[in-house]
């Protein structure tokens, strides 16, 4: 494993030896010990948002998108309407989920380098009283842009609407307090800022809303109300759980708390991000976003203009030096992305910058 490249991606990401070793034990899915493991994971997750009084944590097999679809399908009534706020590819995915599920929706789209504002949402909700829910990406992974969640949440509450937050790339690293930020659902996953492995999503669902959602869901497997009710009654998952993923997440959460919890995780990622931004600027590579809206999760960089730069060649050369980067996901300009999360510190980020600089020299890329 020592020769494995460092994943500078937004997840899956580089995990610790302890987290990987936790997957070497096999668990019985109905066994009391595994049920206790699941309960412990949910309890620790709720503690991160101070949400135990107001929300249930409902785990779900699959990727984060599975959990997002389950949240929308379970909590938005068949006759509800969702306002989807979009400034990147994952906001577009929210709209696609609503379309596939047959939920009425409208969209509000801003440029990929422009956060949605609370004023935008205030105006949109005043103009369309039929909206019941607003769906928002907290940190839009296609760029790394951070949308102003607390301000938007307060506007939505003032209008008497309900908020669904895709916090896939922010949960565990950026502060979200359920006592201060009103939301009906917040969705995240095991393989992001918690530094577990992929395979389990989870939804923090407001207790009364979840109880009232019986019969809403479009799917048996993705019915969060039924999943929670069964877990509350039996302690078990309804269908085969990702036992090794849960065990790895439990171990990752122990390390999360040992590190110092959210403040320490946020600080490390912030240090990683600053090291990356400073180092790349010195070699002429500049970030797509201004600093004030850049989340310390993933950074989008403008690609060099030099025709000798080709991303596939660049990617393979950087990979050979021990780092896996991420392709750009923007429509208007050519970019590439570098993640700041995972089991890596500032020294690792500087090593990645050095590798990028060396590769660009090897490729004789001059026009950056």
UniProtKB/Swiss-Prot annotation:
PANTHER family: 2-AMINOETHYLPHOSPHONATE--PYRUVATE TRANSAMINASE
SS bonds (residue pairs): none
UniProt source species: Pseudomonas entomophila (strain L48)
Key word Iron present: no
Quaternary organization: Homodimer.
Gene: phnW
Pfam family, one: Aminotran_5
Stored NCBIfam families: PhnW-AepZ, PRK13479.1, transamin_PhnW
GO molecular function: 2-aminoethylphosphonate-pyruvate transaminase activity
Name used for this protein in its record: 2-aminoethylphosphonate--pyruvate transaminase
Family label: Belongs to the class-V pyridoxal-phosphate-dependent aminotransferase family. PhnW subfamily.
């Amino acid at each position: 494993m020592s020769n494995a490249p460092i994943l500078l991606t937004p997840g899956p990401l580089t995990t610790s030896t302890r987290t990987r070793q936790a997957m070497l034990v096999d668990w019985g899915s109905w066994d009391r010990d595994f049920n206790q493991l699941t309960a412990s994971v949910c309890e620790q997750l709720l503690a991160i948002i101070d949400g135990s009084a107001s929300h249930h944590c409902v785990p779900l097999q699959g990727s984060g998108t599975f959990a997002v679809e389950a949240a929308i399908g379970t909590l938005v009534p068949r006759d509800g309407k969702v306002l989807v706020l979009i400034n990147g590819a994952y906001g577009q995915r929210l709209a696609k989920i609503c379309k596939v599920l047959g939920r009425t929706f409208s969209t509000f789209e801003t440029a990929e380098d422009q956060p949605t504002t609370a004023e935008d949402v205030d105006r949109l909700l005043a103009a369309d009283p039929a909206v019941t829910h607003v769906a928002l990406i907290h940190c839009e992974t296609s760029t790394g842009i951070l949308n102003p969640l607390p301000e938007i949440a307060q506007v939505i509450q003032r209008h008497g609407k309900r908020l669904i937050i895709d916090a896939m790339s922010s949960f565990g690293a950026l502060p979200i307090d359920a006592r201060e930020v009103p939301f009906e659902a917040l969705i995240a996953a095991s393989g992001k800022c918690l530094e577990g492995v992929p395979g389990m999503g989870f939804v923090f669902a407001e207790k009364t809303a979840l109880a009232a959602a019986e019969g809403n869901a479009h799917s048996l497997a993705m019915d969060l109300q039924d999943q929670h009710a069964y877990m509350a009654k039996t302690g078990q998952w309804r269908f085969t759980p990702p036992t090794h993923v849960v065990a790895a997440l439990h171990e990752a959460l122990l390390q999360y708390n040992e590190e110092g919890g959210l403040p320490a995780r946020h600080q490390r990622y912030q240090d990683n991000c600053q090291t990356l931004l400073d180092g790349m600027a010195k070699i002429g590579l500049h970030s797509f976003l201004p600093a004030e809206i850049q989340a310390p999760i993933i950074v989008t960089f403008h690609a060099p203009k030099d025709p000798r730069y080709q991303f596939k060649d660049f990617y393979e050369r950087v990979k050979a030096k021990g780092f896996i980067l991420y392709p750009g996901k923007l429509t208007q300009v050519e970019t590439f992305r570098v993640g700041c999360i995972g089991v890596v510190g500032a020294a690792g980020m500087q090593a990645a910058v050095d590798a990028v600089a060396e590769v660009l020299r090897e490729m004789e890329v001059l026009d950056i």
